[in-house]
A protein has these predicted regions:
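Active-site gating/interface segments in enzymes
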Residues: 1-136
């Protein structure tokens, strides 16, 4: 991804989420540039990844290139697996493992999916995502 701030008072929020299963590989290479004239820019770049297997791999490289001196910019990246304690908690409440995994995967994806403005599309994408990933 590439975001180029060239004028003052720009704002950007980039959220890029990945969910990997099996032997999947993913690369995130995102860059935000804040030009000299783009004073008062407020930019945030976030990459979050969820690995559903031991074989999956994510390479993530968020970048900020800032030429202005009066800005508020940040970036970050995370790679993790399903929270075993959360999975245990759900299981201890009688929720089957498959449903527990589905709930945790959906919770992870919801932040990105919430940005889809048409509800029927959002629901369809959510169902496709869960159908593909829950059995892994």
């Amino acid at each position: 991804t590439f975001i180029d701030h060239a004028k003052p008072h720009c704002t950007s929020r980039e959220l890029y989420k990945g969910i990997l299963s099996g032997k999947a590989r993913a690369v995130f290479n995102g860059k935000i540039v804040v030009r000299l004239d783009a004073q008062k820019t407020d930019a945030m770049q976030t990459n979050k990844n969820l690995l559903l297997s031991e074989e999956g791999r994510v390479d993530t490289k968020p970048e900020l290139e800032i030429f202005a001196n009066d800005v508020k910019c940040k970036h970050g990246a995370t790679v993790g697996q399903l929270d075993k304690e959360a999975l245990f908690y759900l299981r201890s409440r009688g929720i089957p493992e498959r449903e527990s995994r589905r709930l945790l995967i959906q919770a992870f994806a919801n932040q990105a999916l919430a940005g889809l403005p048409i509800e029927s599309i959002r629901e369809g994408v959510t169902e496709l995502l869960l159908a593909r990933l829950v059995g892994n």
